[in-house]
Amino acid sequence: MVKTILSQVKEYKRVSILTPVCMLGEVIMEMIIPLLMASIIDKGVSAGDIHHIKVTGLIMLLMAAISLTLGILSARFGAQASAGLAKNLRQAMFEKVQTFSFSNLDKFSTSSLITRLTTDVTNVQNAYMMILRMCTRAPATMLIAMVLSFAINGRLASVYLGAVVVLGLLLFLIMSKAMRYFKEVFQKYDDLNASVQENISGIRVVKAYVREPFETSKFHKAAQNIYDRFLSAEKILSWNMPLMNFTVYASILLISWLGANFIVAGSLTTGELMNLLTYCMSILMSLMMLSMIFVMVSMSTASAQRICEVLDEQPDLTNPEHPVFDIPDGSVEFRHVDFAYRKDAEKPVLRDIDLKVTSVETIGIIGGTGSAKTSLVNLISRLYDVTAGQVLVGGRDVREYDLETLRNEVSVVLQKNVLFSGTILENLRWGDEHATLAECQRACRLACADEFIEKMPDGYNTYIEQGGTNVSGGQRQRLCIARALLKKPKVLILDDSTSAVDTATDAKIRRAFAQEIPDTTKFIIAQRISSVQDADRILVMDEGQISGFGTHEELLQTNAIYQEVYESQTNGGGDFDEGGEG
């Protein structure tokens, strides 16, 4: 874990080294100053030597200035190093997520990834800053002060050496108990973020069903869980200060009493006693500082582990050692394919799929919810890998192709239509960043999106809000289809992508496809048989298996499921189940 985190320091190694170096210099200056102060008292004030007081005082001022400068530099370098580490961690995690397959992403919830990219990275950033500065300052202060104290008077120094040992053990017990609650806190942050994300993204549904009180209650519960665990940890940590104060005051009283006796006996000077008291405070405060460092590091350890889970996750889908960069045509073949989302699944989602589609064919796919329609087409663009068998595109196993090449040639319009913040033109150019305005207009004409775009005041420069909330569901679908067409793919997959448009527009889109992109192999998943009945062939899916495959007329004669649904839809009745992932 430590190696993974530190590997992201990269260009900030120099400032990461300079931070503790400057801090060590500051501590050395601070530890020498009490010795000079003792000299002023014993050799200057007591002896009435004004010259000694002036010279030593100037040296003290110089050392204080050096200490201050080194402290400022240490803080500056530490801020650069910790902020740089946080930046690199966020970039590394985000870039790693971009390489994940769908199966990798299934292991992390959206809210969990957001927490890791924000709260967890901030915790590690703060801990790194503290480690660079305070983890240098506290041990160095304790060590130097202890050595100097024993050099002055070993018997008095042993008093707070014993106090340090006792206090250290007590603080360790406190920190160990508090750590358990901090680990739980960060797990509960995921629940809080999930509640916020779901509520904001689904606010229209919440209001439509008057579920504001329920959602508010759910959020309050998540917030209360975090509060309760933080409070439990803080109750334990609240013992830190009383124990610290008791130890400090007890040590000062004991050292003062013993020191006074030593002064009377002539074995200790007043300046040396002041030094000992100063070093006593420095040692005990350093111990308190270490206890706070322990808390911060303990909290950040939980965050660091969660960050490393993302960075150490290996993508399930990778390019072959010698990838193929050319796909000759849009033919697609499934050879006895089995597929499951998890390796430990009791039964596969797809079972023994054997299917051959020639280039330029239009294939309709229908089936009820859970029949694995989407799972089937996801294998063509290698969003997932098969569990058994082979999927071939252009006569080659999809695992032989360069992933970017494959996905550029197999364009998918997913069930969930997603648009991004930006203009319509910017969204369209996700399909081809170099597409001209004329090419974008042609794609929109094929998708019947030009009809509403031209009515907008700003046309193709109309700004799309986050998630496409300022356009209708049907308009989002048509823009997503146009975006996919700009890739000029050899294979086009429409996953129930016209469900929100009216039947007339649906028919216009299908006619445009037939006339304008006849050389593209098309897979059209639909709930309405009218959307696929003109396809070259229609695939009927049922519980992860092929129930029927043929033309509309053939299926009406041979497939009971197809017959039943066709008759029902023709008579204005039922439909395949809608809304689920097929």
For each of these PLM feature ranges, what is it?
Residues D49-I53, I144, L148-A163, S232-R306, ...:
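Helix-loop-helix
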Residues V21-C22, M29-D42, M63-T110, I114, ...:
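Juxtamembrane helix-loop junctions of ABC transporter transmembrane domains
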Residues M1-I33, M37, V45-I59, L73-G78, ...:
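Membrane-integrated ABC transporters
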Residues E11-R14, T99-S103, T119-L132, T136, ...:
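An intracellular "coupling" helix at the cytosolic face of ABC transporter transmembrane type-1 domains
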Residues E11, V15-I28, M60-M63, T69, ...:
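Transmembrane helices of ABC transporter permease
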Residues P20, L24-I32, A65-I72, V124-A127, ...:
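Hydrophobic alpha-helical transmembrane bundles that constitute the permease/transmembrane domains
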Residues A47-G48, A83, Q91-T115, T119-V121, ...:
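Short intracellular "coupling" helices and adjacent cytoplasmic loop segments at the cytosolic face
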Residues F325-G582:
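ABC-type nucleotide-binding domain
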